[in-house]
Amino acid sequence: MRLIPFKIESVTETLTEIPYGVKHIEAPKLWKNGEKGEGIVIAVLDTGIDRNHPDLVENIIDGRNFTDEGSEDDYSDRNGHGTHVAGTIAAFENGKGVVGVAPEAKLLICKVLDRNGSGSYQSIIEGIRYATNWVGSKGERVRVLNMSLGGEKDDELEAAILEACAKGIVVAVASGNEGDDDEKTLEYGYPAGYNECITVAACDENKKLAYFSNNSLQVDCIAAGVNVNSTYLNGQYAKLSGTSMATPHIAGALALIIGLGEKQ
């Protein structure tokens, strides 16, 4: 199992903006009504996170490393992908840098991929089950799970996803970047191919389907995935492209929807 290939467009040390993808899904409208994902825990199964990033440190609730890279408690990101995904979901609103879709949600970091973006199916399955059964110090439970990764079909992986769904966790996954810019071609990957998942394709700033985005009957929704600004390694920011970047927009949106529903 590997990261779905992505492209680094640029890296910068300073930035202040609400990324266009966050605006696309109209998250700021919910913020104005007081819904920012407070109390909602989102599990991020990826390459880890920059634990000291100023836009993320406030929202990391817990984490664990399931790779061979360091100790169980070392879920630091040595790739950049996981940090970028986490920022799109829940970068803290601190007046600088970027802000995520659900800026008051909490992040449970499950490092299942190493610095090269590789991980075993067993590591990913263990990460899913850890997130499914995790309980916070105040009784918090995971409500949303984000996986911006892909590989071959695996029955045990699907079983773990089914276990998560049975406990009320919504699973958002990337559709994949094997698209050929032909709407008639259908590209399939996994876990995107499982019916239990919300599968996310990518669009650009003009809301046009990205040329690289997988297009299949399993795609449920589309979100920004081209030149997406978010958090990156060493406290920096980066523009990345890929369906990996689209998926966390939906994970964050799900947190807002869940929070809103619980208040009504």
What are these regions (language model features)?
Residues 108, 170-172, 199-200, 222, ...:
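Structural detector of well-ordered beta-strand residues that form the stable sheet scaffold
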Residues 203:
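Carbohydrate-associated surface elements
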Residues 55, 59, 196-199, 227:
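Glycine-centered tight turns that cap/initiate beta-strands
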Residues 86-89, 108-114, 134, 225-264:
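Hydrolase catalytic cores
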Residues 112-195, 206-209, 215, 233-248:
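Substrate-binding/access-modulating region of protease and related hydrolase catalytic domains
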Residues 1-7, 16-19, 26, 138-149, ...:
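C-terminal subdomain of the subtilisin-like protease fold in secreted/lumenal serine endopeptidases
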Residues 3-6, 12-106, 123-130, 136-141:
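Active-site core segment of subtilase-fold serine proteases
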